[in-house]
Amino acid sequence: MVLAVSLYVNKMTSKVSLTNDQLKDLGLYLIEPARELGEFKLIDSFNNEFVPDDFKGRWNALFFGFTFCPDICPITMGMLSRIEKELGLVAENKIKVFLVSVDPDRDTPEQLKIYLENFNDKFIGLTGGIDQIYNFATRVNAPFSPVINSEDPNYTVDHYGSIVVINPEGKYAGFFRTPHEQEKIRLGLLELINKQL
């Protein structure tokens, strides 16, 4: 395992692209050709309208979850925060991390902002109408089971665990499958940074 990671690190520093099989070993599955996202309008955690074109110009890592999630969401956001800090200037303006809410009834822009500040103040939350979110999630193969008008205030939402990748052209480019391993995702993101736009 250590040898394999070392080989990946050597390839990264020499800017040699990894093969698709090597990317899959890192848990990164790229889709070729990348797919259009379609149209949607969401609201970000700063109360600004967010549309597909807002993904353009950088790589984007999206996790579909919710702020009341008891396990995989905080674990994943914490891991992505550590990765972002490890990458430092290498990733500056080249990768943006998003939490896309699958629970818009509870996840207001303000709630998302407060939640994400616990992990990384560079992260952006996205929320909006359940139909808009569901259609977007379907486009990027991130299924979830919407909960509408639940009488239980402590309800949970079943959702996808992988990390969706959107390329600098604003297209669905692939995903990091579960289970997540921090070092592998870091190396996969480095490979994306090294790719030509």
Please give the residue ranges for each predicted region.
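Conserved helix-turn-beta segment immediately C-terminal to the redox Cys motif
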Residues: 58-59, 76-99
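Short active-site neighborhood of thiol/selenol oxidoreductases, capturing the structured segment around
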Residues: 50-76, 80
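Thiol-based oxidoreductase modules, predominantly thioredoxin-like and allied folds used
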Residues: 94-107, 122-131
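Short, internal strand/loop/helix patches
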Residues: 113-160
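Short loop/turn microsegments at loop-to-beta-strand junctions
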Residues: 37-38, 60, 160-162
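Hydrophobic beta-strand positions
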Residues: 41-42, 165
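N-terminal targeting signals for export/organelle localization
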Residues: 1-39, 196
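Thiol-/selenol-based redox modules, centered on thioredoxin-like
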Residues: 151-197
